[in-house]
Structure formats: C-alpha cells, structure tokens
Amino acid sequence: VYVWRTRGVVMAALMGVGALGGLMMLPSRRQEMEVSEASAMGRVESWYEGIQMFIGSPVFGIGAGGYSDLHELTAHNSFVLVLAETGIVGFTVWLAIVGYCFRMMLAIVERGDDIIDDVPLEVPDEVALKDWKTDKALSLCLLLSLTGFFTAAFFLSRSYVVILYLLVALVVGHYTRMRATYPSLPVFSLEKDLIRWPSYAVIGVIGLYLTVKVLLAMA
C-alpha cells in the first residue's frame, strides 16, 4: 500500500512481481513457496484451467458455479474464478466494484488537512481537525482491510463470499458520509470511467495469463 501510494500502481506491481520471483528462487525449507511442490502446482493448474474456461467462453463466461462442475478443484484465485464464470463482462463489473472501493479510500487517505475548510465555520478548527483525523484513520483501516482481503483472495476462491460485499458496503457507506461532510472529495462516476475499467480488465486478463504461463514454465 505504501509503494502504491508513493510510487504508483505500476511500480507497486513491478516490485510485487520481482519480490515473488526473488522469493521463489531463494533456497528455502518453506516448501509452500516452491512452484514445483505438489499443492502449489495444483493451484497453478487450477488457475490455468480457469483461463482455458475463459478462452472457451470469453464474453459471459461459463456461468456461476460452473468452474466446480468442470474441474475437480476450486479455482484458488478469486480473479480467475470471476473471469471464468462471468467472462470479460462480469470481470469488468466486479473489477470496477473492487477498484472503486480502493479509489474511494485512497482519495481520503491521500487528502491533506486543508480539507477541514469544507467544514462549516461555526465548527472550531481544532474540533474539525480532530474529526478529520479520526475519519482519515478509519479510511486507512478500511483500505488495509481491502488490501488484506484481496491479497488472500488472489490465492483463494473468495469472489462471492458475503464478507466481501459487507466490506464493500462499509467502504461505500463511509465514503458517502465523508462526501457529505467534505464536499471537495472527488465524485466517482461510471460515466467518467467507461474506458478505464474495460481497459483495466483486459490488462488484468493479460497479467493473469502471463503469470500462469511463467509459473508453469518454472515448474
């Protein structure tokens, strides 16, 4: 999250991939880090099967619950599962929901204390600043919760679990209240992002495909 906030998404992604590659090349007794280890290889093969299902039905996918009907294991990757079962259309929508949650919390966390100028003049500055610090801390907590959940979700099938959508509801509710209190916070609208999310979805598909190919080649 720190690298993402200070250096940007691309740098964070590159550092993440580099760190993963470095860990996998280090000699270690932690067998779960080895791609060639049986359970890890089974996980990668599950990702590969999900990609193949997507290639077979790229627009709307194979349908909810279809992955487990066609493969003996779960996808072990929430992104692959959504991609396989809902196609590029569903993946784009799901990615937009996730992406907006991150953008909302980042918009608050990255905002300076000058935002208290939005607060009515009758509220003392020290009170307004204290309330803003509390709201900002809560936003950071929600951002870290999102980060933790989706870090785990990359290795587990958690695409449809209720806890995800409760977390989404908390984030949206919190941002709605923050927008009412601090009107200078940005408004997020699909009308402004009609190109953004389909583009990110395509980039995500390519990234997943290349990741699987690299891991299979390393096995």
Features from the language model and the residues they span:
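A cytosolic-side transmembrane-helix exit/cap motif
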Residues: 9-18, 31-39, 181-190
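Structural signature of transmembrane alpha-helix termini at the membrane-water interface
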Residues: 1-4, 22-27, 96-109, 154-158, ...
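Transmembrane-embedded, aromatic-rich helix segments that form part
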Residues: 1, 10-15, 91-96, 161-166
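Generic hydrophobic alpha-helical scaffold/packing signal
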Residues: 51, 80, 84, 93, ...
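TM-adjacent membrane-interface loops and short helices in multi-pass inner/ER membrane proteins
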Residues: 37-94
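Transmembrane alpha-helices of multi-pass inner-membrane enzymes
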Residues: 10, 145-153, 157-219
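Hydrophobic alpha-helical segments of polytopic membrane proteins
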Residues: 1-26, 197-206
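Hydrophobic transmembrane alpha-helices and their immediate junctions
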Residues: 1, 88-145, 171, 176
